[in-house]
A protein has these predicted regions:
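Active-site histidine-anchored catalytic micro-motif
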Residues: 12-13, 17-22, 27-77
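Internal helical hairpin/lid segments
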Residues: 111-203
């Protein structure tokens, strides 16, 4: 589960090459960064990292720049905010006029966050509020951000399922850690995988359609046989609708 497990496997098997596939937003990037720092400090040559960490702000901007966006507000990701803080989300109300509430994960957290967004909309306010203040500091986890800045660098661009190429939306290993970069060591070619034509995850993410309005929802696309990213992840909107809301198929207007 931990990248340190991959490092341990490399340490215990010096005759084998071990590649850790690093994924996730800023939530998981610090643990990868600390693992790479340890690998460098211990001099473990058979350990490398295939870095596919992504960043939260560029895809949010891409969504907000979409001309067909139909989202009135954002429940901010509490897990990402524990690392980056509340400050990076200020551009949403400042530049796009939409409220943001950073939320915890308990049912009462989510309910309160929705209430806070609705209150902002009702009162004509537009700001970043931090419902998850018991965990999320405004400036984030400074130590984690410092380690990430040392180990990672921004990629020029990165391709997202349903959203296409987004500039500087993902991380690679910095030059100081090139010896542990699997892309460098193994000359990994760039591979493009086209989005399935029937998949409408992009429209779901932008609020253009509800998950159950997708042509393949619940038939060709299920959690067991997912076509799109919104169904692959248990946190995805389509997976949530499939598991908990398949029969609530009426649009609600606020």
């Amino acid at each position: 589960y931990s990248p340190l497990d991959a490092l341990r496997i490399a340490r215990e098997n010096p005759d084998r090459e071990v590649v850790f596939f690093a994924i996730g937003f800023e939530t998981t990037a610090p643990s990868t960064a600390l693992t790479l720092k340890r690998a460098k400090a211990e001099g473990i040559p058979n350990f490398t990292c295939m870095c596919n960490h992504v960043t939260i702000v560029p895809p949010l901007r891409a969504l907000l720049d979409s001309p067909d966006l139909r989202l009135d507000g954002f429940i901010g990701p509490g897990h990402v905010a524990t690392v980056v803080g509340a400050r990076p989300f200020q551009f949403i109300p400042a530049d796009y006029g939409r409220p943001v509430v950073i939320s915890g994960f308990e049912p009462v957290d989510l309910l309160q966050s929705v209430q806070m967004i609705l209150r902002q909309l009702r009162e004509g306010r537009c700001e970043v509020e931090n419902q998850y203040s018991r965990v999320v500091p405004h400036e984030g986890n400074l130590r984690a951000l410092e380690v990430m800045a040392e180990v990672f660098a921004l990629r020029p661009h990165f391709e997202w399922r349903g959203l296409g190429f987004i500039s500087q939306s993902a991380l690679r290993l910095s030059d100081a850690y090139a010896d542990f970069d699997a892309e460098v060591r193994y000359s990994v070619p760039g591979v493009r995988v086209a989005d399935p034509k029937a998949c409408q995850c992009g429209e779901v993410l932008k609020g253009v359609i509800k998950p159950w309005e997708c042509k393949v929802f619940g038939s060709a696309c299920t959690p067991e046989h997912a076509i799109g990213t919104c169904m692959v992840s248990p946190e995805g909107a389509c997976a949530a609708y499939y598991n908990y809301g398949r029969f609530a198929r009426e649009r609600e207007v606020v």
